[in-house]
């Protein structure tokens, strides 16, 4: 009997260690991500300020470096006001459903060779499935607010996200054909051999479609009709305040970094060095992801907001046909002597 008790205690201790280690790894991923989100807002204000010949944040800390911390403290101190006609439970559930997929998707993102929380073979499929759930948070937030502005913004956002997910999915089919794997680490390893081996070159139209569709997916300018200030105040989160509003903000920027990271992994060689004489590593992943994020901010500073009908037309009549044509072209070329150019 004593032996059985000791064995059970040993199993419990092993289970506890496994759970504790998993929680440590999750925190090691989430904490830097939240810091990255905070300082992406700072970078956005600084970079767009520089493009518009302004200074940007410069009051809190050296060169305004503590501005994100000040913003977080301000939002934490504000009251979360629930409108009188709102559905209380769904109103609170909306931000949770928005942030959860944005964080959960990071479980399968590899930062370097072997540096990944969960290296699963269906990583690409997992990311596509989990990120598509973010739209439920948007719809619930808009509907539960009991506001016409919020509901209109939610409907716009939901239609836009669903429309551009199709183009993004087709773009990923091209990557899947080239790498012949759904494992994100294997997709990166398939681009080994320098910058000339990146999938950016044979799949360039799919790269452009994926990048622009990613901007639309995250409701960023110039595709931010869901929160068009001049038309419907602030979109689906118009009734939110305090930390509930901040959670939507975090979800948007976490999704931005996620799209940039996926673009890096699938088209720009991930953590692989572009030249043979420099070693691979997480530094390359950070530099490439930072470059894609810079493009996101550059788009915002450059382009005016599109009309809703223009956004829908671009998604359905331009991007989806381009991706289908290029997938057929790549599939056909793979059956010819030039097929090695697409692997």
Curated annotation (Swiss-Prot):
Any GO molecular function: oxidoreductase activity, acting on NAD(P)H, quinone or similar compound as acceptor
EC code: 7.1.1.-
Catalysed reaction equations from the record: a quinone + NADH + 5 H(+)(in) = a quinol + NAD(+) + 4 H(+)(out)
GO cellular component: plasma membrane
Protein's UniProt keywords contain NAD: yes
Record-linked PROSITE patterns: COMPLEX1_ND1_1, COMPLEX1_ND1_2
Keywords carried by this UniProt record: Cell inner membrane, Cell membrane, Membrane, NAD, Quinone, Translocase, Transmembrane, Transmembrane helix, Ubiquinone
Biological process (GO), any one: aerobic respiration
Membrane topology reported for the UniProt record: Multi-pass membrane protein
Main location: membrane
Compartment(s) of residence: Cell inner membrane
Residue ranges of the TM segments: 19-39, 89-109, 124-144, 158-178, 198-218, 257-277, 279-299, 314-334
Function: NDH-1 shuttles electrons from NADH, via FMN and iron-sulfur (Fe-S) centers, to quinones in the respiratory chain. The immediate electron acceptor for the enzyme in this species is believed to be ubiquinone. Couples the redox reaction to proton translocation (for every two electrons transferred, four hydrogen ions are translocated across the cytoplasmic membrane), and thus conserves the redox energy in a proton gradient. This subunit may bind ubiquinone.
NCBIfam families, sorted: PRK06076.1-2 (NF004741)
Family: Belongs to the complex I subunit 1 family.
Record text on subunit structure and interactions: NDH-1 is composed of 14 different subunits. Subunits NuoA, H, J, K, L, M, N constitute the membrane sector of the complex.
Protein name: NADH-quinone oxidoreductase subunit H
């Amino acid at each position: 009997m004593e032996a059985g008790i000791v064995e059970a205690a040993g199993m419990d201790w092993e289970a506890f260690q496994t759970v504790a280690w998993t929680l440590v790894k999750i925190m090691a991923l989430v904490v830097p991500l939240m810091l990255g989100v905070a300082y992406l807002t700072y970078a956005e204000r600084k970079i767009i300020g520089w493009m518009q010949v302004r200074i940007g944040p410069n009051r809190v800390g050296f060169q305004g470096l503590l501005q994100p911390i000040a913003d977080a403290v301000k939002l934490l101190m504000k009251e979360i006001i629930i409108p009188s006609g709102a559905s209380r439970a769904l109103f609170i559930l909306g931000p949770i459903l928005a942030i959860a997929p944005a964080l959960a998707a990071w479980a399968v993102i590899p930062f370097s060779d072997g540096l990944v929380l969960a290296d699963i073979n269906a990583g690409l499929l997992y990311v596509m499935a989990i990120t598509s759930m973010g739209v439920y948070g948007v719809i619930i937030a808009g509907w539960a607010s009991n506001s016409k502005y919020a509901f209109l913004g939610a409907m716009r956002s939901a239609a836009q996200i669903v429309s551009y997910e199709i183009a993004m999915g087709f773009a990923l089919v091209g990557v899947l054909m080239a790498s012949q794997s759904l494992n994100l680490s294997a997709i990166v390893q398939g681009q080994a051999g320098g910058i000339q081996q990146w999938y950016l070159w044979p799949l360039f139209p799919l790269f452009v479609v994926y990048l622009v569709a990613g901007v639309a997916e995250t409701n960023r300018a110039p595709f931010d009709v869901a929160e068009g200030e001049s038309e419907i105040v602030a979109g689906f989160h118009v009734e939110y305040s305090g930390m509930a509003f901040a959670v939507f903000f975090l979800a948007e920027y976490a999704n931005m970094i996620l799209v940039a990271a996926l673009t890096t992994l699938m088209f720009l060689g991930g953590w692989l060095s572009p030249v043979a004489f420099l070693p691979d590593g997480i530094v390359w992943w950070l530099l490439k992801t930072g470059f894609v994020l810079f493009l996101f901010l550059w788009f915002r500073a450059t382009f005016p907001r599109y009309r809703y009908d223009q956004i829908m037309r671009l998604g359905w009549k331009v991007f989806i046909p381009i991706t289908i044509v290029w997938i057929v072209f790549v599939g056909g070329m793979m059956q010819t002597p030039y097929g090695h150019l697409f692997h």
